[in-house]
């Protein structure tokens, strides 16, 4: 053994060839600060070996290196810029020394090589991969950019266009694509990986492969003519501006850095990468996006822990076909759980099957499946007008009309047709689960399962625990949702549960602004362009359906009369009374016409201004700051109440539910992350300016207490220990 660290070791293989093996405790390898330091020590040992002829890098895990240790990021981001820059220089010196070894090097890459893992193998001369490879640089999705030389080496290896596509979008690619663009040199079966890598290494040692020529382009300026450079970088900057926008500075910073570094050799180019990385790491956007990653891991880990002792349902059923039922049936079947889809008429069943077939055909068109797979999936969805097969199902989700009487009748009837241990769930969006449970003989086997539309796209499923829902019931439904590829978050019961309960105060803030003379077009523009929502409130209401919102608004008002009962006729009432239901009938705040792809395109409609004039004061202008404050305060206050009342368990789950269920702008990180970034004291000062607008603007007492001590909702993060304490030489 040449070297043994906590996460890697170095040993001789044969005839002057050494192997450097990543083998961290636990299930995966991460390139954390300790591993980088250990890698530097191992390379120091290699540099002393006069008889070294070649080096093989490999992993003892199912994945090569999954990336940097993101749990370290928030504390690293608090380190002063100078110290962070110093540590990055040290880390890059380690990879440079790996790249500069006077012998050929190869990485045998299995599974994932992401972020720092990808940057590590870019420093070797050759890369051989297995078919399950996923390799790339996802850093821009975390609000930063590659910091271990990825923005320098990848463009020089692949060419600017291929590298920009991966780096700016934070993409990873599979084995075939990686081979095609030159990111790996070959792909072999897993059992042949080491043998194949050794064969390449021997060829390089024997002079059959020119490893020095392979290495040289990574040390030099990027080979691009002035015209090629102008075209590549102009197109990349245009694409990034269009897709990422101003709220995500990392992608455009990465592109500009690669452009600026193109004319330099490795050392100067790495210095530019360092200078760009450090300021990005100190942005609120980076902290928010890293926070989302960590919250996502937490939520998924919680679901895994919850379901460790239950069997995932093997057969499911959906009550109520149509678009929603068809979407749920498709998602279940697509992920391998056969489903019976029941309705009371053929027309609805046809609609449900058509929806499932449409979604499968899209997969076929994209080349994700072939005709055989399509036929196989669709054959596991069984449409029926009766209860045939219900005696074999493990879980049933009801997705009929949003009417408590109808839902109770359907659920009570279904309970008589299934096994005593079958779990029933309701896809209601607002009706309390404990109220629906009153119709059942076995309420312990019942809970809520709130999907979001469109089912195949929206990652969140709210799992609602009723007063009598058993732990086993919740666990089974969480297991099914996870199997369907969704992110389940368990919440406690109340009208609207969590997501809709906090959404309708936001809509109420919108209605009050319109009542006071604001223009809905400006509100939408501000909430989209300035705050960052994917849709402004008017557009969102049109997509949700004005009729749906009108009904849900009444349910929420009955559930929370003190805050959500309004004493005036609002814009939603006016549009509903005029039969303007949104996209579903082509008339809402906007008029909708289908574009060439069959998607609804919004157009101005002057009739709306006349309708709104009946329920609004004369038009007046509002500042962007006031619009954002009046829209967000009711939502954030309600989010805080949900935490205080135990409707949602943690700030992390609340923020993920908002991001995954409502499209809360990820660069804000969710309501609690936004609140912490703003500061509770500053938020309280802002909210108090609007408390005269009514109970929705009254800040909960718990938040007032936080503000008095300026406490955050997330646990405070300590800066990483001074970088000088790490090995930096």
Curated annotation (Swiss-Prot):
Alphabetized PROSITE patterns for the sequence: 3HCDH, ENOYL_COA_HYDRATASE
Ranges where the record places region Disordered: 708-729
Pathway assigned in UniProt: Lipid metabolism; fatty acid beta-oxidation
UniProt binding sites for NAD(+): 324, 343, 400-402, 407, 429, 453
Organism annotation: Escherichia coli (strain SMS-3-5 / SECEC)
Disulfide bonds: none
SUPFAM superfamilies listed in its UniProt record: 6-phosphogluconate dehydrogenase C-terminal domain-like, ClpP/crotonase, NAD(P)-binding Rossmann-fold domains
Nucleotide-binding listed as a keyword: no
Region described as 3-hydroxyacyl-CoA dehydrogenase: spans on this chain: 311-729
GO cellular component: fatty acid beta-oxidation multienzyme complex
Pfam families in UniProt: 3HCDH, 3HCDH_N, ECH_1
Site (Important for catalytic activity): 119, 139
Keywords on record: Fatty acid metabolism, Isomerase, Lipid degradation, Lipid metabolism, Lyase, Multifunctional enzyme, NAD, Oxidoreductase
EC number assigned by the record: 4.2.1.17, 5.1.2.3, 5.3.3.8, 1.1.1.35
Any one of the GO BP annotations: fatty acid beta-oxidation
Complex and partners: Heterotetramer of two alpha chains (FadB) and two beta chains (FadA).
Protein name: Fatty acid oxidation complex subunit alpha
Family per record: In the N-terminal section; belongs to the enoyl-CoA hydratase/isomerase family. In the C-terminal section; belongs to the 3-hydroxyacyl-CoA dehydrogenase family.
Function (record text): Involved in the aerobic and anaerobic degradation of long-chain fatty acids via beta-oxidation cycle. Catalyzes the formation of 3-oxoacyl-CoA from enoyl-CoA via L-3-hydroxyacyl-CoA. It can also use D-3-hydroxyacyl-CoA and cis-3-enoyl-CoA as substrate.
Residues annotated as catalytic: 450 (for 3-hydroxyacyl-coa dehydrogenase activity)
HAMAP family assigned to the protein according to its UniProt record, in alphabetical order: FadB
Residues the record lists as binding substrate: 296, 500, 660
Residue numbers spanned by region Enoyl-CoA hydratase/isomerase: 1-189
Gene expressing this chain: fadB
NCBIfam families the UniProt entry points to: FadB (TIGR02437), PRK11730.1 (NF008727)
Single GO MF descriptor: 3-hydroxybutyryl-CoA epimerase activity
Catalysed reaction, written as an equation: a (3S)-3-hydroxyacyl-CoA + NAD(+) = a 3-oxoacyl-CoA + NADH + H(+); a (3S)-3-hydroxyacyl-CoA = a (2E)-enoyl-CoA + H2O; a 4-saturated-(3S)-3-hydroxyacyl-CoA = a (3E)-enoyl-CoA + H2O; (3S)-3-hydroxybutanoyl-CoA = (3R)-3-hydroxybutanoyl-CoA
């Amino acid at each position: 053994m040449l070297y043994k660290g906590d996460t890697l070791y170095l040993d001789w293989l044969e005839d002057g060839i050494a192997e450097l093996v990543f083998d961290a405790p636990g299930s995966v390898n991460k390139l954390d600060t300790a591993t980088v330091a250990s890698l530097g020590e191992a390379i120091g040992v290699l540099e002393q070996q006069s008889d070294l002829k070649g080096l093989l890098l490999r992993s003892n895990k199912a994945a090569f290196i999954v990336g940097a240790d993101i749990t370290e990021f928030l504390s690293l981001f608090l380190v002063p810029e100078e110290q962070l820059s110093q540590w990055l220089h040290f880390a890059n010196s380690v990879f440079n020394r790996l790249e500069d070894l006077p012998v050929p090097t190869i990485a045998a890459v299995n599974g994932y090589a992401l972020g720092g893992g990808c940057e590590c193998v870019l420093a070797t001369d050759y890369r051989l991969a297995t078919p399950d490879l996923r390799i790339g640089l996802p850093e821009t999705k975390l609000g930063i950019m590659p910091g271990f030389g990825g923005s320098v080496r990848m463009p020089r290896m692949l060419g600017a266009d291929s590298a920009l596509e991966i780096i700016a979008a934070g993409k990873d690619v599979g084995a075939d694509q990686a081979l095609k663009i030159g990111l790996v040199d070959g792909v072999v079966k897993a059992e042949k990986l080491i043998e194949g890598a050794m064969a390449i290494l021997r060829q390089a040692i024997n002079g059959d492969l020119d490893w020095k020529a392979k290495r040289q382009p990574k040390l030099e300026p990027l080979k691009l003519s002035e015209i090629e450079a102008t075209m590549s970088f102009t197109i990349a900057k245009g694409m990034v501006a269009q897709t990422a926008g101003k709220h995500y500075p990392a992608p455009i910073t990465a592109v500009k850095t690669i452009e600026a570094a193109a004319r330099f050799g490795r050392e100067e180019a790495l210095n530019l990468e360092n200078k760009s990385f450090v300021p990005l790491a100190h942005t609120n956007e980076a902290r928010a996006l890293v926070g989302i990653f960590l919250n996502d891991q937490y939520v998924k880990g919680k679901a895994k822990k919850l379901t460790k002792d239950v069997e995932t349902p093997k057969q499911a059923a959906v009550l109520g076909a149509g678009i929603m039922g068809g979407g749920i049936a498709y998602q279940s079947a697509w992920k391998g759980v056969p489903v019976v889809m029941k309705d009371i008429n053929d027309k609805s069943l046809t609609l449900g099957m058509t929806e499932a077939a449409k979604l499968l055909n899209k997969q076929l068109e994209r080349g994700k499946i072939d005709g055989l797979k399509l036929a196989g999936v669709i054959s596991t969805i069984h449409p029926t007008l009766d209860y045939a097969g219900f005696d074999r199902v493990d879980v049933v989700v009801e997705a009929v009309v949003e009417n408590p009487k109808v839902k109770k009748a359907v659920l009570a009837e279904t309970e008589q047709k299934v096994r005593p241990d079958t779990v029933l769930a309701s896809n209601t969006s607002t009706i309390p689960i404990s109220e629906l449970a009153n119709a059942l003989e076995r309420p312990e086997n019942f809970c809520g399962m709130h999907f979001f539309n469109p089912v195949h796209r929206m990652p969140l499923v709210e799992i609602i625990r009723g007063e009598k829902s058993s732990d086993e019931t919740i666990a089974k439904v969480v297991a099914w949702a996870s199997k369907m590829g969704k992110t389940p978050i368990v919440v406690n019961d109340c009208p609207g549960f969590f997501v809709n309960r906090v959404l309708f105060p936001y809509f109420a803030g919108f209605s009050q602004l319109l009542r006071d003379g604001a223009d809905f077009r400006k509100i939408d523009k501000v909430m989209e362009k300035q705050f960052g929502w994917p849709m402004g409130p008017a557009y969102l209401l049109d997509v949700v359906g004005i009729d749906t919102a009108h009904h849900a608004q009444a349910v929420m008002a009955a559930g929370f009369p003190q805050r959500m009962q309004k004493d005036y006729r609002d814009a939603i009432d006016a549009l509903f009374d005029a039969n303007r239901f949104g996209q579903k009938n082509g008339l809402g705040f906007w008029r909708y016409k289908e574009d060439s792809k069959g998607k609804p395109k919004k157009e101005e409609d002057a009739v709306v201004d006349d309708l709104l004039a009946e329920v609004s004061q004369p038009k007046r202008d509002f500042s962007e700051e006031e619009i954002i404050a009046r829209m967000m305060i009711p939502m954030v206050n309600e989010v805080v109440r949900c935490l205080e009342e135990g409707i949602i368990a943690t700030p992390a789950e609340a923020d993920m539910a908002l991001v995954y269920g409502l499209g809360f702008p990820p660069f804000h990180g969710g309501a609690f992350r936004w609140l912490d970034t703003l500061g509770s004291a500053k938020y309280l000062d802002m909210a108090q300016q609007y408390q005269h607008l009514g109970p929705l603007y009254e800040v909960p007492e718990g938040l007032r207490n936080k503000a008095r001590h300026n406490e955050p909702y997330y646990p405070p993060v300590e800066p990483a220990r001074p970088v000088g304490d790490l090995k930096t030489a």
